[in-house]
Structure formats: C-alpha cells, structure tokens
From Swiss-Prot:
A GO term for molecular function: creatine transmembrane transporter activity
Record's function text: Functions as a transporter for creatine and as well for its precursor guanidinoacetate. Transport of creatine and GAA is independent of resting membrane potential and extracellular Na(+), Cl(-), or pH. Contributes to the process of creatine biosynthesis and distribution.
Location within or outside the cell: Cell membrane; Basolateral cell membrane
Protein name (record): Monocarboxylate transporter 12-B
Gene source species: Danio rerio
Pfam family of the protein (one): MFS_1
Gene for this chain: slc16a12b
The entry's keywords: Cell membrane, Membrane, Transmembrane, Transmembrane helix
Membrane topology: Multi-pass membrane protein
Main location: membrane
Reaction it catalyzes: creatine(in) = creatine(out); guanidinoacetate(in) = guanidinoacetate(out)
C-alpha cells in the first residue's frame, strides 16, 4: 500500500462513495452485457421475418460484441481526457438511439448498422470507463467490488431473458427492441454517479500528482511567470499518452493478452447458440429462454463467490490459478453439451457454465490490475477488451457456418471448448516455465561462492560436502 501511494500519489478509499460507483457499474453491466446476451433471443424472429440463415443473423450479435470491444480504447481515451461521467452518458444516449432505430428495421443490413454498430459503440463508451472507476476506488476489496459490479451481467440475463421473450410474444420483436431502447437509457443516470476522486493529499500537495500516471504537474503562472509554449504542451501530452501504454512492453501482459484472444474466440458461442440449440433438440421457447435465466443467476454466484474468495489473504496470490481453473472448466462444459439433448440435462450445463463464466469475468479486471498496476488499469482494460473484438466478430458467424454445413451444433460447441481450454493451458504452461526457471535460478545461486571476511581480508568461502571442514582460499584481486 505504501509503495502504491508513493507511485500514484493517492490511495483508493476502499468504500464510501466507492459503493455507489459499484452500483453504477452494476447497472452498466446489466444494460450492456445482459442486453447483448439477450440479442440471441431475437435470432429466430429475425430468421423468420427476413428469411435468413443462422450465419446471417449471427452477424448482428458479432457486430455488437465486436464494436463494443473494438471501441473500448476510445471509451478509455474519452474517460481519461474528459471524464468517465461524460463517456458513460454519451454512450448511454448512443446505445438507446441504436436500439430505438432498430425497431424500424427493414432488412438485416439495417440491423447491422443500428443494432450492431451504433448500439455497440454506445456500449463501448460505457463499459470500460465504468469498470476502470471501480479499480480506482478500491484496492484491498477490489476483487469483491468487481464481483458485485460484474454480477449485473448475470442478474440482468436472469431477469431480461424471460422478459424479452414475453415482450416479443406480446409486442413483436419491434416493440421489444423499442422498450429495450428506453431501458438502456438508464446508462445516462449511471454516468452521473461516476464522481471523480478528490483526495486531501492532493489539496495539501503544492504540486498535484496525477492519479493515473504518477507524475507531478506544475500549474502555469499568470503574472509574468514562465509559461510553456504550445509545442511544449503538445510534447508533454504526447509523452503522457505514451506513458499510459507503457504496460504493452511487459512480458506478463503480452502472455495475458494471448490468453484473452483465445478466450474471446470461444466464450461468446454458448451464449449465441444455447437457445437455438435447445429449440433444435425439441425444448420449448419458454424453457429455452429459462436456460439463459439459469445461466444468468448462477453467473451471479460465480461473480460474487470468486470475488470474495480471491480477496482472502490465503488466495490473493493465487488469483491467476483461480482464473485459469475457471476458464478451463468452462471449456470442458462446452465439450459435453452435444451429449445433452433434453431440458433436464441442459440445466446442469447452464449451472456449471454460468458459474465458471461469472468467475472468470469478475477476475479479468482483477488479474489485469495485478499485472499492470492501478495506474495503467483504465488504458489496459481498453486494450484487453479491444483484443476481444476480432474473435467476437468472427467466431459466431464461423459457428453459424459450421451449423449450416454440418447440420448440427457439435462442431460449434467443440470450437468453443477447445478455444477456452487452450486459453487456460497457455497461462498454465507459462506459469510452469516460470516456476522451473525460478527453481533453476535458486539452484545456480546456491552454487556461487560466497564472499566472507577473515582477519580483515576478503576471502572466498566454498561450503564443503563434509560439514566438519571449512575451506578458505584467499580471494584474488
């Protein structure tokens, strides 16, 4: 903690208004991630109305996810340069407009632009700044705070999935999208809660310290004092921007980034194809939507329990292992789903997959913060979610193409499972290599002769195999 205060100049309050930040981030995850998950419920309606196949409608979900992640650095940039409050309010307005315009769609291409691109852009401006604010307000209880905040995705899915299905049945898919547009407008209210930190240390300090980057900024003088030129200010801003992305040179972050790429390739497929798969094997519409609700509520348990557990002192240093375990188990669940062909058997899948999904989702910002530090968290999260963009874009259409080609969902769920397991194995392999390197380094250091002093002269001491003997050789200068 002392070291973090020295670097960043400030300490997070770990409570107080921070819990309002958690509440705001909770609603942001409901309005962004839960709504994105529920878009798959519209797929059957879109296929019937526009006479398109699986791969064509899957592009809608891909575009929402891809745009949300691809524009995540833009959300971080607006949050850093202006404020997180402005970013979230602007994003909420754009997302609401996108959903309302989607209710007037006349073609799938129209939905690609409104529901896919415009709504996804609004979600991007909201998601990253809100998550970063939680990390700024919390340190000791960071994992628990993130667990509560990210549980909004599961709670939202549990509530919205059957509600959206009922809205479609009573008001058609157009009316359901219009109502969702009004609901998502609550993001603007959440943005108003994201109050920047004002600390007493900054008021007492003659040179204010930037809470994100850790450097002192000298204010310009007004009465005849020296002022920096515009060119100097531009260079300073450029240097500060470069410093914000210094974490890209960290080897640990590069490995984590590779793992995220594999993770993103497989994690979205079950959410896209669980309901269509259930309908294909004969499960009713309400029961299929209820599977998403079960997945969502168990997601909450995974969010909070893993967040609370990894904040314990005995597990805090094993957060990476907990993350690897959750991702690996999620992959195993996907490998077994083609064997589950009734509602009774699909319920355990929703329970297990939802739990481990909630676990790793809550740990993504925590693990990222542990690797790059709090001062780089906002920019790092922008890059992390940016890495999800291309896999989110291509994996659902590839899954739909596999369904159209093979006539079954087996290959699609196998693709998801192997991608998730590979993500976990990458981190596990690097951890094993690091462990072996540390042991090898310890063994090599134990063999290096130690320098000791004997009667004022420097000598080399070699510990002999026989403990009763000591060999002392004068050191050569």
């Amino acid at each position: 903690m002392a070291q973090e205060k020295k670097k960043g100049g400030v300490l997070p309050p770990d409570g107080g208004w921070g819990w309002m930040i958690v509440a705001g981030c909770f609603v942001v995850t409901v309005c962004t991630r839960a709504v994105t998950r529920c878009i798959s419920i519209f797929f059957v309606e879109f296929q019937m109305h526009f006479a398109k196949d699986y791969s064509g409608t899957a592009w809608i979900h891909s575009l929402v996810d891809c745009t949300t992640m691809l524009c995540a650095p833009l959300g971080s940039l607006i949050g850093n340069q202006l404020s997180c409050r402005i970013a979230v309010i602007l994003g909420g307005f754009l997302a609401s407009v996108g959903l309302v315009l989607s209710s007037f769609a006349t073609s799938l291409e129209y939905l690609y632009a409104t529901l896919g691109l415009l709504t996804g852009l609004g979600f991007a401006l909201c998601y990253t700044p809100a998550i970063a604010m939680v990390g700024i307000y919390f340190c000791e209880r960071k994992a628990l705070a993130y667990g509560i905040a990210m549980s909004g995705s599961g709670i939202g899915t549990f509530i919205l999935a059957p509600v959206v299905q009922l809205l479609i049945e009573h008001y058609s898919w157009r009316g359901a999208l219009l109502i969702l547009g009004g609901f998502v407008l609550n993001l603007c209210v959440c943005g108003a809660l994201l109050r920047p930190i004002i600390l007493k240390e900054e008021e007492a300090c003659p040179l204010p310290v930037d809470s994100e980057c850790g450097y002192s900024v000298k204010p310009p003088t007004l009465n005849g004092g020296p002022t920096r030129s515009a060119a100097s200010d531009a260079k300073q801003r450029c240097f500060q921007s470069m410093q914000e992305y210094h974490f890209l040179l960290m080897p640990d972050f590069l490995v984590l980034a590779g793992s995220f790429l594999l993770l993103a390739s497989g994690c979205s497929l079950p959410f896209v194809y669980l309901v269509p798969y259930a309908l294909d094997v004969g499960v009713g519409h309400q029961h299929a939507a209820f599977l998403m609700s079960i997945l969502g509520v168990i997601d909450i348990v995974g969010n909070i329990t893993f967040g609370w557990l990894t904040d314990r002192r005995c597990l805090k240093k094993y957060r990476n292992i907990c993350y690897m375990f959750a991702v690996g188990m999620e992959g195993l669940c996907c490998l077994f789903i083609p064997l589950l062909r009734t509602f009774v058997w699909l319920v355990p899948f929703s329970v297990l997959y939802g739990y481990f999904d909630g676990a790793y989702v809550a740990l993504i910002p925590v693990v990222t913060s542990d690797v790059v530090g709090r001062q780089y968290l906002s920019s790092a999260l922008g890059v992390v979610y940016f890495l999800h963009a291309v896999p989110y874009l291509v994996s659902p259409p590839i899954g739909g193409w596999l369904v159209d080609t093979t006539g079954t969902y087996t290959a699609t769920f196998f693709l998801s499972g192997f991608a998730l397991i590979s993500s976990s194995l990458l981190l596990f392999s690097v951890a094993i290599i690091r462990y072996c390197q540390r042991n090898q380094k310890k063994n090599s250091l134990s063999k290096i002769p130690k320098l000791v002093s004997c009667e004022g002269k420097q000598v080399d001491y070699y510990p002999p195999k026989n403990k009763d003997l000591m060999l002392i050789i004068p050191a050569t200068s």
